[in-house]
Amino acid sequence: LSGAKVNRWRTRATSMDVEALKAEAGKAACEYVTDGMNVGLGTGSTVKYTILELGRRIAEEGLNIVGVPTSIATRDLALEVGIPLADLDDLDGLDVVIDGTDEFDPSFQLIKGGGAALLREKVVAQSSKRMVVVADDRKQVSTLGAFPLPIE
């Protein structure tokens, strides 16, 4: 999404605390979700924590959102934690999509596409007013292109 505002939470991870940092990043992304929103739910090991936190907020705080998953795994987890889901075609767009990335550079340009859900992720992202990307420093590269990507 061109012209997007970038917020930067920067941490350095050791192998022992990678999951804790992913959880922190996933939860921080939930700050962009408020009551009544239509939310694109991305795919990946960090977004998993976003989905878990949104499920907690629905159960404990009464958060009222509708999610649109980008993959079967995301759909299954969202249903498991109680996030109501809809098809993108049934909504008038999305307020925010939260997704991961395969790599990003110091200017916060990014590449996605290493996973199996790329097409659906692109469609959902284009339908959203805002995109929040969650990633840890292991995904940062000096020059984009280090991650092998399939060509569509």
Language model feature labels by segment:
Residues G40-T46:
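Glycine-rich beta-strand-to-loop/alpha-helix junction loops that act as flexible
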